Design a protein with these regions (language model features):
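Chalcogenol-based redox active-site neighborhoods
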Residues: 1-177
Length: 177
């Protein structure tokens, strides 16, 4: 059994190169946002909690954009399911990436679940990350289930604080405890 390993702030994050709904690709670091890429890993179109979360992300995406933050929602869904999610949340400013391999999800420290009922056989659980233009982790949060994610409005407030106070990434100490 492989246990997820958390990513460390101020260290490089794993590579991402994924197709986007609409035909382009999201390649982390190829065209970095001015301040952060906000990566929201979600469970898939089968998840109503994910839909609600992405609706809120889309609603606040213009505010993130004003602050130099690009919003990308990522799942292991295949193309058809990703298009359905994009339609459900009326994705405009939020890019919807898909075909995340489970090995890549694990590299990002995400938890994996076995499907039940109409869910995919296996899929990633949620995670939210802010990645700096240099490819290092600024903030990360992972969940074992769809509930209790960081509210999108709180993330926006955190971005504001980070910008105005020039606040460094925290949680970076990996020495002896």
């Amino acid at each position: 059994m492989t246990t997820p390993t958390p990513l460390m702030p101020r260290e490089r994050v794993p590579a991402l190169d994924l197709p986007l709904v609409g035909g382009d690709r999201y390649v982390l670091g190829a065209k970095p946002a001015q301040r952060f890429d906000l990566l929201v890993f979600y469970r898939g179109v089968h998840c109503p909690v994910c839909t609600k979360y992405l609706l809120e992300l889309e609603r606040l995406a213009p505010e993130f954009e004003k602050r130099g933050v690009r919003s990308v929602a990522i799942s292991s869904d295949e193309s058809e399911r990703a298009v359905k999610m994009a339609e459900k949340v009326k994705a405009n400013l939020v890019s919807i990436a898909f075909d995340l391999q489970l090995s890549a999800a694990r590299a990002w420290g995400l938890y994996l679940s076995a499907g039940r009922g109409e869910e995919p056989a296996y899929f990633n659980e949620p995670g939210v990350f802010l990645v700096k233009p240099d490819g290092t982790l600024y903030y990360g949060s992972t969940q074992t289930m769809p509930f209790a994610r960081p509210p999108i409005a709180d993330l926006l407030g955190a971005v504001d604080y980070a910008i105005t106070k020039d606040y460094p990434a925290r949680g970076e100490y990996a020495g002896e405890a």
